[in-house]
């Protein structure tokens, strides 16, 4: 303690001495230390509360969902919520009461997924595996080593899941045996934002968004490419400018595929032939939400926007929460729910 105090006295004395020779001079690290922090987002705006929010339940679980170095997220199926943590566990909680139904020790570093059906649970690990575990007795039914990290897993469709890996491959896997049914690949981009949108299945086709803004429609049975289209980058001056990942959730509604890319576009595409119906230059790393007539998304500036599904015309925007809003919006009962950075 004496050494520290002595250092401070000498330091302050030195500053005082410097002031005599250089009037008005104060070292930068002194001014910056006492300078009020400037936040990169606006303050919370004033608003009139006209909706009551009631907490139904709260549950404290061991571990945490740490998605800084993974793509962990909760998954809901029926009245169950599957919660992966950084302690290799997956907790199953009642969505009605918050009661902990069971905890499954996977023995692996859960990295991505989680997908579940009535019987099995599927997830990707940091060990580059995809695993199917029986929910009733926690038994591993099958496990396959993939060519790279598992970035996303589709919902189960006709006893098949479709897995996207970090090397831009998509693999169809039989959920009963773990057998690879087919594998198809794209040329990986030289630079990308680490992430991947979840494959979606509709009418015997699988739709996947890749890191170069490319959307590919595959035949779900054979893996053959039916069509592909690319959402162009807004800017192309540098490699960073050309980042154009499709990492957020895509939507299919009435035969139209809606997708959005980072530094690229929001587009409506005919899911049958890949024809672009309309396109807007926007940028978002998050996914889309919808109701009957509109598409909702959050721009990179944290501005919530609503556009017409059929024309692509912007109907409204909410910019009072500039850079505060994060994540994919959720449409529920004529409300749009969005996370705040604080």
Predicted regions and their residues:
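Extracytoplasmic beta-rich repeat domains
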Residues: 19-28, 50-75, 100-117, 140-157, ...
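Blade/loop signatures of beta-propeller domains
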Residues: 30-59, 225
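Short loop/turn segments that connect beta-strands within beta-propeller blades
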Residues: 94-97, 134-138, 174-178, 220-223, ...
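Structural signature of WD-repeat beta-propellers
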Residues: 85-86, 125-126, 165-166, 210-211, ...
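Sec-dependent N-terminal signal peptides
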Residues: 4-12
């Amino acid at each position: 303690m004496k050494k520290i105090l002595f250092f401070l006295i000498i330091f302050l004395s030195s500053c005082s001495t410097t002031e005599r020779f250089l009037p008005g001079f104060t070292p930068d690290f002194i001014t910056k230390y006492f300078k009020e922090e400037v936040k990169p987002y606006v303050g919370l705006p004033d608003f009139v509360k006209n909706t009551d929010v009631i907490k139904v339940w709260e549950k404290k679980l061991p571990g945490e969902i740490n998605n800084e170095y993974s793509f962990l997220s909760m998954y809901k199926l029926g009245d169950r919520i599957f919660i992966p943590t950084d302690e290799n566990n997956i907790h199953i909680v009642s969505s009605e009461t918050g009661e902990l139904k069971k905890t499954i020790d996977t023995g692996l570093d859960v990295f991505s997924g989680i997908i579940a059906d009535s019987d099995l649970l599927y997830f990707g690990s940091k060990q580059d595996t995809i695993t199917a575990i029986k929910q009733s007795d926690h038994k591993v039914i099958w496990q396959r080593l993939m060519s790279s990290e598992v970035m996303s897993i589709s919902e189960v469709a006709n006893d098949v899941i479709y897995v996207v890996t970090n090397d831009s491959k998509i693999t169809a896997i039989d959920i009963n045996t773990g057998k690879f049914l087919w594998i198809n690949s794209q040329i990986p981009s030289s630079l990308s934002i680490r992430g991947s949108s979840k494959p979606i299945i509709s009418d015997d086709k699988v739709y996947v968004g890749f890191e170069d803004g490319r959307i590919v429609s595959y035949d779900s049975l054979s893996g053959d490419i039916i069509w592909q289209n690319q959402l162009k980058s807004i800017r192309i001056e540098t490699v960073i400018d050309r980042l154009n990942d499709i990492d957020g959730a895509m939507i299919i509604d009435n035969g139209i595929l809606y997708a959005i890319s980072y530094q690229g576009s929001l587009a409506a595409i005919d899911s049958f032939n890949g024809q672009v119906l309309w396109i807007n230059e926007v940028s978002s790393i998050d996914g889309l939400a919808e109701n009957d007539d509109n598409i909702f998304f959050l721009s990179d500036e944290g501005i919530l926007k609503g556009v017409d599904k059929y024309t692509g015309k912007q109907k409204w925007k909410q910019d009072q929460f500039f850079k505060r809003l994060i994540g994919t919006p959720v449409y529920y009962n004529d409300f749009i729910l969005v996370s705040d950075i604080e």
